[in-house]
UniProtKB/Swiss-Prot annotation:
Family under the similarity heading: Belongs to the GroES chaperonin family.
Keywords annotated in UniProt: Chaperone, Cytoplasm
Presence of keyword Cytoplasm: yes
Assembly and oligomerization: Heptamer of 7 subunits arranged in a ring. Interacts with the chaperonin GroEL.
Molecular-function GO terms, alphabetical: ATP binding; metal ion binding; protein folding chaperone; protein-folding chaperone binding; unfolded protein binding
Protein name: Co-chaperonin GroES
Pfam families according to UniProt: Cpn10
SUPFAM superfamilies named among the record's database cross-references: GroES-like
Name of the gene this protein is made from: groES
Function recorded in the entry: Together with the chaperonin GroEL, plays an essential role in assisting protein folding. The GroEL-GroES system forms a nano-cage that allows encapsulation of the non-native substrate proteins and provides a physical environment optimized to promote and accelerate protein folding. GroES binds to the apical surface of the GroEL ring, thereby capping the opening of the GroEL channel.
Single GO cellular component term: cytoplasm
Localization annotation: Cytoplasm
Length: 97
């Protein structure tokens, strides 16, 4: 995939949601829901501050993140693969192993 986000934008590939309930029941369709976890595929250079400095992003390529799947998140199909384009501020947490 050849894409470079600008400024504080991040490209994320949504992780598949767990398809079984805690009781072992297989969930399908909308019952499984959409995951709000994903892997960071690309990051912009950083957020431009009021004084003109560029603040590097906290997330990096390969991070697994939890994100807010709301208004500011844009889904795009690139190379037949759906990715999400979001601002770093849409990312709520980095999952650490």
């Amino acid at each position: 995939m050849n894409i470079r986000p600008l400024h504080d934008r991040v490209i994320v590939k949504r992780k598949e949601v767990e398809s079984k309930s805690a009781g072992g029941i297989v969930l399908t369709g909308s019952a499984a829901g959409k995951s709000t976890r994903g892997e960071v595929l690309a990051v912009g250079h950083g957020r431009i501050l009021e004084n003109g400095e560029v603040k590097p992003l906290d997330v990096k390529v390969g991070d697994i993140v939890i994100f807010n799947d709301g208004y500011g998140v844009k889904a795009e199909k690139i190379d037949n693969e759906e990715v999400l384009i979001m601002s770093e501020s849409d990312i709520l947490a980095i999952v650490e192993a």
